[in-house]
Amino acid sequence: MVLKAGLIVNDGKELAVQTASSVQEKLEKSNYEVIRVSSSGGMVGFANPDQHVRPLGYTNCVPEGFDSSMEFAIVLGGDGTVLSAARQTAPAKIPILTINTGHLGFLAEAYLSNLNEAIDKIITGNWDIEERTCFIVSVMRNDQRRWESLCLNEMALHREPLTSMCHFEISIGRHAPVDISADGVILSTPTGSTAYSLSAGGPVITPDCPVVQLTPIAPHSLASRALVFNDSEPVTVFPATPERLVMVVDGNAGCYVWPEDRVLIRKSKHSVKFIRLEDHEFFQVLRNKLGWGLPHVAKPNK
């Protein structure tokens, strides 16, 4: 029986393209039908933010042939490629093996140094799945959905250059609205807590916590701090600013948000299924990638 596998490649990087060819050859020798696509298919409106209306919704990012019959998909690229690939695979419930050919590789499971071993493990079925929560980010105007995307890391809504500070009214479930004056706001998943939100002063959240994090960007108040709340609460952001704002999702999807729009964020029924080839200890990843918990002064060897 012929099995089916996906290959999602950052085709703008020569190293990823070259590696993809060798991975595809190895899979085909193991009786896999390989469907190879570009990770650019997961980028939503990023290059053309004026192209606002996307009536088909976020499931339109899933490539042809990526369905329930696919055993897994291998992602070749950096963290940005993984974020794009998440939109291409999560709605179809396809597990992904992330192989880093980029820089930091915070979301990577394997590297070029252990590529052959990783491919052997995935072919023999020697792997587990870790699920990560996603949000659905929708731009609404009255009752019309004007734009929508799946979000693994964060949604950032902020001012354009050379414009003044922004004002937001944020509604969280049935709670009283929150008013924030800042350069922007970030709403992140636990996975995204180590990305843009961390740089803006938000806390690190372990991936298994069912929460949302709201982090202001350069707030104009000493009392304005990051807020963490249950992810069962839908969030609506109302821009109270006369100028248009820029919304960016996961660093590679986005559009303009106008004063008459509102941004709705809610937990998605689709999660990203990461393939784990070995024990994935989160604190160890923090230590290795971000230097968390390292001593400030080197200790002498015994």
Curated annotation (Swiss-Prot):
Gene3D superfamilies: Probable inorganic polyphosphate/atp-NAD kinase, domain 1 (3.40.50.10330), Probable inorganic polyphosphate/atp-NAD kinase, domain 2 (2.60.200.30). NAD(+) binds at D79, G80, N153, E154, D183, T194, A195, Y196, S197, L198, S199, A218, N252. This is NAD kinase 2. Involved in the regulation of the intracellular balance of NAD and NADP, and is a key enzyme in the biosynthesis of NADP. Catalyzes specifically the phosphorylation on 2'-hydroxyl of the adenosine moiety of NAD to yield NADP. It holds the Pfam family NAD_kinase. GO terms for molecular function: ATP binding; metal ion binding; NAD binding; NAD+ kinase activity. GO terms for biological process: NAD metabolic process; NADP biosynthetic process. SUPFAM superfamilies: NAD kinase/diacylglycerol kinase-like.
